Amino acid sequence: MTFDKYADVPHVDLLVNDISVTPQGHRLAGKSTVKVANNNAKPLDKIIFYLNPELTVTSVEMAGKNLPFRRDHQGIEVDQPIQQQEELTLTINYEGKISENICYTDVLTEDYLDTKVPQVFWRFGKRYAWLSNTFTLLTPECIWYPVTIAPVNPGAPYNVRKNFTDYTLTVHYEGDKTVLSQGKSKIDGSVITFTNTSALPGISLTIADYDKKALRVDSTDYEIYYFKGHDYFSKYFEPLSDTLPGVIREVKNSLEIEKDRDYPFGKFVLAETPVQFATYARNWKGYTEYVMPEILFVPERGISLGQDFEAERRRMNEWGRHGGPMDETEQNISLFNRFVSSLTSENSQNGWNPDNKLINKSNITPMLFGHTNYISSPEYPVIDIAVNNMMNTSSDQGFRFWGGIINDKQRANLYLESHSFETAIGDTELKPEIFYELLKLKSAALNNYITSQITQEDFNKFLKAFFTSRQFQNIPFDTLRYEIEKRFGIRLSDFIDTWYTASHTPTIYIKDVDANQIVLDEFTKYQIKFKVNNPSDIDAIISTEVMQGGGGGMRRGGGMSFE
């Protein structure tokens, strides 16, 4: 496979990509003027690019001269030496169709061929890209413009670098449909130009027969693009026209406080796609192709989001008969908040069992993390997604009665009893949902190691300042490790290798648990004591969570959880 062939070949960094495309029915003519840099430790005798294999490269030019090149499916070898730390500007001309077969080559065959959609009875088939007069949707997965880093590394999935590139897109389009991409758009006749103020990991192109609704709140533009005749939502939110800006502001502020990150883009877009548009949860990436910088692609009528506004309103009216009525404004605000929560939750429910969950493919919180930074480490390729997960996910370590059905978190714990994190990232048989739970456990362990020596608040403040000052950049892990040691005196090198390579977990014995109620100055406090023994050959970190619950019966009572 071509991706494997070039996986270990040194690659240049893509600094600038000025793209010009002309859609021509099922074909596309394009020109990319790119600036690349050799940040490797040695000179290179050739430059590697990737492009959809159905797009034919007609020429590669530099300073007005044609450069020799060879094509190997999606790979392009350009015979141009580049010295260490040297920057070069090249122009690549290409033309042709878009092959969807290049998409998701790392996904297991059984998942690739599975046409089921959770909680949806019908099967719609799968599409990964469109290029036609009626509809166009191109994402980085289909490599519709030249890049220097492959979208996947099948042999080592977590060893995929990320470029943050200054993109400009010019679309020459004679039709009457809406052209949508990242950045600020400028229309000059049949030429639409999109300019971005930040370096991005990738961009998309959509051309569709859309209607649009837009609202500006503070400094952010909120836009909804939906197929004509598909406005099923306005009647629920039009009564909120006066209060909606305040509701949106509150939701945005709440998300930023919860995630301790500011929304980094100037606009937020919901764009409807055909229901067949499919993507996959890949833990090494941390987000799906539904979630692009600035843009969330929503399958037709929001069918995969499980948001039926009319059914929700009927339930509210039914509940109102028992607990007091909600007026129309309260109902509409509740509908809006429920919809937003479906876009910010880590998991989506699959059936009635609360432990039977799927990774939420429409979770937009990676816009605050995965689209803004990348931590690179050849030794620990999983460190980027682990740190992002540590910052992005909420704690769910609380006490829960076990109903006799093993859940994915317990399966992850069982896996780690005899496997290392290093082994897990190469285990293609490990379900994504189990690996996600394993990733959360390992991310929590990394966080606990640090916060056993400093407060969580101090660590959160450090992380926010560290990543905000390096926004839209590739950051070497050594830089993060150095800054943590400089700021707090914590040596991650004393912990990280065992965290990554240990092939078993510690054995912890807990006994003599005793809880006492103490009244001090009319305040009731609790003192909890227990003994811990670790007879194993691996250090362990104990974290405790104290919960206060109700009375007897089968109701949830007080409890503790240990890690």
Question: For the regions a protein language model found, what residue spans apply to each?
Answer:
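Amphipathic alpha-helical substructures
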Residues: E429-D512
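Extended, low-hydrophobicity, Ser/Thr/Pro/Gly-biased non-transmembrane segments
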Residues: Y94-Y210
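Solvent-exposed beta-hairpin/edge-strand motifs
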Residues: L44-N66, H172-D176, M547-G549
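A surface-exposed beta-strand-loop module
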Residues: N52-P118, P154-Y158, D188, V247
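Beta-strand-rich binding/interaction modules
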Residues: T56-M62, L180, Q517-E563
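Juxtacatalytic substrate-recognition/specificity segment
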Residues: L169, L215-A386
